């Protein structure tokens, strides 16, 4: 979903004659496409998004944000697409927002917060590879997971607000086109005032 959103935003930037670039990362910055104008450049961004195969394991959003802050010399609109589940990203995001106009697009998957009643299930952390056996047959287990997820989402929201960035919340089970269009239209109206 993040790749699709990146592609949509790249084409929108090209259509408005805005520069577009990308910074792709895992546990380290792996690929940088410097901002430039034009449909051809936007298509290159999309091609690189589609072809990106991270070499690293895990996510270091904080390092990517620090890199972006150093990379961008002129004030720019920076869109950060992430689930923001990594640690330590809030200060680097606030620093980036001090120099640039930042939009944080959060992507959440309800399957990560609502466990089905499926008995014993082995869960694997996609970033660390750590596995754990969980008995999802108990309501209290499912409730604890749900409550922990809700607390994490609330904490993420507080950090994004403190960083002073615009926020767009998307969900994997809901088509993103309309919420994304509405969010950017509202943002444009607000910035015109």
Each language-model region and where it sits:
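Exposed, interaction-prone extracellular/peripheral surfaces
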Residues: 1-193
């Amino acid at each position: 979903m993040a790749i699709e959103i990146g592609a949509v935003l790249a084409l929108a930037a090209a259509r408005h004659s805005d520069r577009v670039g990308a910074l792709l990362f895992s546990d380290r910055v792996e690929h940088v496409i410097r901002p430039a104008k034009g449909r051809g450049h936007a298509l290159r961004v999309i091609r690189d998004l589609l072809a990106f195969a991270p070499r690293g394991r895990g996510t270091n959003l904080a390092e990517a944000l620090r890199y972006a802050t150093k990379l961008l010399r002129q004030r720019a609109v920076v869109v950060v697409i992430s689930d923001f589940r990594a640690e330590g990203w809030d200060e680097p995001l606030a620093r980036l927002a001090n120099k640039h106009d930042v939009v944080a697009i959060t992507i959440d998957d309800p399957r990560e917060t609502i466990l089905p009643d499926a008995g014993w299930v082995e869960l694997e952390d996609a970033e660390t590879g750590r596995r754990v056996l969980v008995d999802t047959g108990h309501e209290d287990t499912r409730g604890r997971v749900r409550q922990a997820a809700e607390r994490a989402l609330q904490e993420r929201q507080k950090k994004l607000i403190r960083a002073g960035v615009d926020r767009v919340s998307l969900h994997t089970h809901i088509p993103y086109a309309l919420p994304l269009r509405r969010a950017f239209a509202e943002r444009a109206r607000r910035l015109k005032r």
